[in-house]
């Protein structure tokens, strides 16, 4: 189990460069151990808690403190000329800058914690070291993308290259989550540069374009949240490379909500639909599986 968690964590490098000699194969699934809080109904209360919580977490994590302070120093220059959605705070922009700075390993550590930190609320409270960063980053994506997913327009077609793992679905038509903050690009060539073990082609309804905030804007990055649900529509192999096509259900699914404020892990994954109803999902699934 520990080895599998490590392998999955390596896959969280996403657009960030990682070359491995041996490429393990892991199945795609719903990532049930992911910490997938969406803070529905408690964002304002979490805003009050997050600022002192961030200070506490930075005091215990030197890299988090250094990364946050470095991004904070450049945020005012970055935000000039940006049109920010209502409610978008400096902390949300700084969180994106911290995540996209691949010159250190903080994004990797965050995604490792996200992928393995959702076993229980107790596990999250005791051992998840990025509670404030997770909140600020999730809220940033929610505010940038807006509510309703694809109800406001078509999803983004993006690409994600992974160099450390070959992901394979169990079968076509499965529902899967990426189970982490997943970096992707509007540019297929960029995705190829960051990994050839697996190439994902995705249509995302909840991923947010973060190019304007990114430390590396030329990557044309779209950041996909851990809780978005996708349908596996195609899978093939090109030599040693897995080619996976995922289509968003326009739906998210979370076991946690407001965990820091007392919300326990729910036994089932609670769905939050966008524009499509259940019947529409079934129709879409049948349509997409046809050749």
Swiss-Prot record:
Glycan attachment residues as annotated in the record: 101, 196, 250
GO cellular component, one term: extracellular region
Disulfide bonds: 42-258
Domain TR mART core: 62-252
Reactions the enzyme catalyzes: L-arginyl-[protein] + NAD(+) = N(omega)-(ADP-D-ribosyl)-L-arginyl-[protein] + nicotinamide + H(+)
Enzyme Commission code(s) on record: 2.4.2.31
Localization in the cell: Secreted
Keywords on record: Disulfide bond, Glycoprotein, Glycosyltransferase, NAD, NADP, Nucleotidyltransferase, Secreted, Signal, Transferase
Main location: secreted
InterPro entries (UniProt xref): ADP-ribosyltransferase_ARG (IPR050999), ART (IPR000768)
GO molecular function, one term: NAD+ poly-ADP-ribosyltransferase activity
Active site: 160, 183, 221
Residue positions binding NAD(+): 99, 160, 180, 214
Signal peptide coordinates: 1-22
Family assignment from sequence similarity: Belongs to the Arg-specific ADP-ribosyltransferase family.
Stated name of the protein: Ecto-ADP-ribosyltransferase 5
Name of the gene encoding the protein in the UniProt record: ART5
